[in-house]
């Protein structure tokens, strides 16, 4: 059986890989949306902060022998602290003036961060060991899905639903929405 001239197995496999990639994009865009919604800043440094988080996790794993799950918790905490420091020291002064200044500042910060990381780590990516729990794969009949890819979808669902719950169903969320 074919869908659009593509064998069903290949179509479902590509659909599932699209879901995995879309899960990464969902988490990235969620951060952008929350920052813009709360601060009114278009954060061009968001991708650079994502990169910094990836390198924090990699450095923890590779250089300090940190457990994968500990690095997974440590990376967003470090990036969150960096984001708070940027907001308190730089962005806070720009709220009452033209939004273009916040955009230019975050764009400049992104260029600086990317330049620093390119200088110290180069332009190729770094590999890291996949934890034993995620090294296996699941046979779905139409494809074999590595567990680490299923983990991405699961983690994205937890993060997105957790953020929705926090913003829509808690007092903190009501406070944040009231702005």
Label each residue range with its predicted role:
Residues 1-39, 45-179:
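Small-residue-rich transmembrane alpha-helical segments that form helix-helix packing/gating elements
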């Amino acid at each position: 059986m074919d869908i659009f001239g593509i064998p069903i197995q290949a179509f479902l496999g590509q659909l599932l890989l699209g879901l995995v990639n879309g899960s990464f994009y969902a988490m990235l865009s969620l951060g952008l949306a929350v920052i813009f919604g709360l601060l009114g800043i278009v954060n061009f440094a968001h991708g650079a902060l994502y990169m910094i988080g990836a390198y924090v996790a990699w450095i923890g794993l590779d250089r300090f022998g940190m457990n994968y799950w500990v690095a997974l918790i440590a990376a967003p905490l470090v990036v969150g602290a960096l984001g708070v420091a940027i907001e308190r020291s730089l962005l806070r002064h720009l709220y009452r003036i033209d939004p273009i200044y916040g955009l230019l500042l975050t764009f400049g910060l992104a260029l600086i961060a990317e330049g620093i990381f390119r200088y110290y780590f180069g332009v190729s990516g770094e590999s890291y060991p996949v934890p034993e729990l995620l090294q296996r794969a699941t046979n779905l009949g139409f494809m074999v899905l590595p567990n680490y890819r299923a983990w991405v979808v699961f983690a994205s669902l937890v993060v997105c639903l957790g953020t929705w719950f926090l913003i829509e169903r808690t007092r903190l969320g009501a406070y944040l929405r009231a702005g």
